Amino acid sequence: LKEFKRIQEGLRSLTEEFIGEYPYYSTWIQKNEATFKDGTRVIYELNDDGKTVGYMMIHFSTAKCAKINGIYVFPNCQKRGYAKEALLQVLEKLKAQKYDYAYIQTRIRNKIVVHMFESLHFDVIGQNYHSIEKQNNWVAVYDLWHRRNFDEMFDLAKQLYPGFSKN
């Protein structure tokens, strides 16, 4: 739990850097603290030579899929490949643990991130209305075994994202 507190403080400072974009984030962390304690939700710290450059949060949602709740790279560390490298490492870890899918959502206007997902072969399969941000977000999925079972992907997306609708 000490490690979680340190990471939680780091997320608070990250939230302060994005003030206005993620004002609800530290409250969300506190509300979901139990899921961090039981291991269904994990925060990874992104490092470069021991220096924290950002964070990634994963929610192990079901036996079949994990939901990447966010990849946050400090503004002064962006556009250096940290998010992409972290995603690649997490996808390998999920595959080794026999997960089928990794889901992620991002703001529609975040074209750079959508391009990164597509370059890693995520499929943008629909949208989710984000009730806190009051806007639609893209929902993308990575099929770890490349089976391309879109019916299953859509069904799982509906379970993970209450406001999900297909493209």
Can you say where each PLM-predicted feature lies in the sequence?
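A short, internal acetyl-CoA/4′-phosphopantetheine-binding micro-motif in the GNAT/acyltransferase core
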Residues: 71-79, 106-108
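C-terminal "cap" of GNAT-fold acetyltransferases
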Residues: 130-167
